[in-house]
Curated annotation (Swiss-Prot):
Main location as per UniProt: secreted
Family: Belongs to the DEFL family.
Function (record text): Involved in self-incompatibility.
GO biological process per UniProt: rejection of self pollen; signal transduction
Any one Gene Ontology cellular component term annotated for this protein: extracellular region
Disulphide bridges: 33-81, 43-67, 51-76, 65-78
Keywords on record: Disulfide bond, Secreted, Self-incompatibility, Signal
Provenance organism: Arabidopsis lyrata (Lyre-leaved rock-cress)
Designated name of the protein: Defensin-like protein a
Length: 86
């Protein structure tokens, strides 16, 4: 009986330890998903594509861009997911 109890307790402790280590691995990675910028001009025609071109010039590769006209300038917000380690 003692042997089976010891086995069950050991199993529970090992399971908790493994799940804790996996949780710590997930926290090592960060994700940046928004890319924003202000540019001169208005959002005319296909402003979303213009935003994508403007933000691509910085070496990024954004997707799903949104153009809004604010304070006399084009405000671009794009999704740009990049995963990097700490």
């Amino acid at each position: 009986m003692r042997c089976s109890v010891l086995f069950v307790v050991s199993y529970v402790i090992m399971s908790l330890l493994i799940s804790h280590v996996q949780g710590m691995e997930d926290q090592k990675w960060k994700k940046v998903c928004n890319l924003e910028g202000n540019f001169p001009g208005r959002c005319v025609g296909n402003g979303d594509e213009q935003c994508k071109r403007d933000l691509t010039e910085d070496g990024n590769n954004p997707s799903k861009c949104r153009c809004r006209f604010r304070a006399g300038r084009r405000h671009c917000r794009c999704i740009y997911c990049e995963v990097f380690g700490m």
